[in-house]
């Protein structure tokens, strides 16, 4: 059986990076991979294990075909390295921090992907965005508005609520992976 792409998505501040970090050790121990995405954000940005590059470098990587998936959101460009294709061919499950707005394009490239939507109560989301201090109030409001516009109603995806316990959410994600519940 081949590997699966587990496409984790959710609003900025929903806890995707925290969740990926919480499951990292067990996913790697089971032979899976968690992808470090490329983002046009300063490498000093708090809270995300990503490779920060300049917009010019991102465009160069894109032109070189370095990305299996790429998109733009919230004024930034994001890329998933092409290396994921090798891991999937090798039979490894691969977790990525994806984008709700790019899900349809990701499904076209990876029809068997497992879409996982991380949800969080709106008041919790606002509090998390304010606490991390990475965006201005205007940017936070724009992110909250984008979250309200991208509900993914009717989409075939697993939903995990991360409003409370990260440990419980991590266990739920690991159960999905183990049971191949997305298949």
Swiss-Prot record:
Signal peptide: none annotated. It holds the Pfam family AAA_18. One of its GO terms (cellular component) is cytosol. InterPro entries: GK/Ca_channel_bsu, P-loop_NTPase, PhnN. The keyword ATP-binding applies. Pathway: Metabolic intermediate biosynthesis; 5-phospho-alpha-D-ribose 1-diphosphate biosynthesis; 5-phospho-alpha-D-ribose 1-diphosphate from D-ribose 5-phosphate (route II): step 3/3. GO terms for biological process: 5-phosphoribose 1-diphosphate biosynthetic process; organic phosphonate metabolic process. It is an enzyme of class 2 (transferase). Keywords: ATP-binding, Nucleotide-binding, Transferase. GO terms for molecular function: ATP binding; ribose 1,5-bisphosphate phosphokinase activity. It comes from the Bacteria. It catalyses: alpha-D-ribose 1,5-bisphosphate + ATP = 5-phospho-alpha-D-ribose 1-diphosphate + ADP. NCBIfam families: phosphon_PhnN, PRK10078.1. Belongs to the ribose 1,5-bisphosphokinase family. Catalyzes the phosphorylation of ribose 1,5-bisphosphate to 5-phospho-D-ribosyl alpha-1-diphosphate (PRPP). This is Ribose 1,5-bisphosphate phosphokinase PhnN. The gene is phnN.
């Amino acid at each position: 059986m081949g590997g699966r792409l587990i496409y984790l998505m959710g609003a900025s501040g929903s806890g995707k990076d925290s969740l990926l970090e919480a499951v990292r050790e067990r996913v790697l121990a089971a032979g899976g991979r968690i992808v470090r995405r490329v983002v046009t954000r300063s490498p000093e940005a708090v809270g995300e294990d990503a490779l920060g590059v300049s917009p010019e470098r991102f465009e160069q990587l894109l032109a070189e075909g370095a990305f299996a998936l790429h998109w733009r959101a919230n004024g930034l460009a994001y890329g998933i390295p092409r290396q994921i294709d090798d891991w999937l061919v090798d039979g490894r499950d691969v977790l990525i921090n994806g984008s709700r707005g790019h899900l349809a394009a990701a499904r076209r490239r990876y029809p068997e992907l497992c879409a996982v939507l991380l949800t969080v109560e709106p008041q919790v989301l606002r509090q998390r965005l304010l606490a991390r201090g990475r965006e201005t109030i205007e940017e936070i409001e724009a992110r909250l508005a984008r979250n309200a516009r991208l509900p993914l109603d009717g989409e075939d995806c697993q939903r995990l609520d991360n409003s409370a316990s990260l440990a419980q959410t991590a266990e739920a994600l690991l159960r999905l992976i183990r049971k191949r519940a997305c298949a």
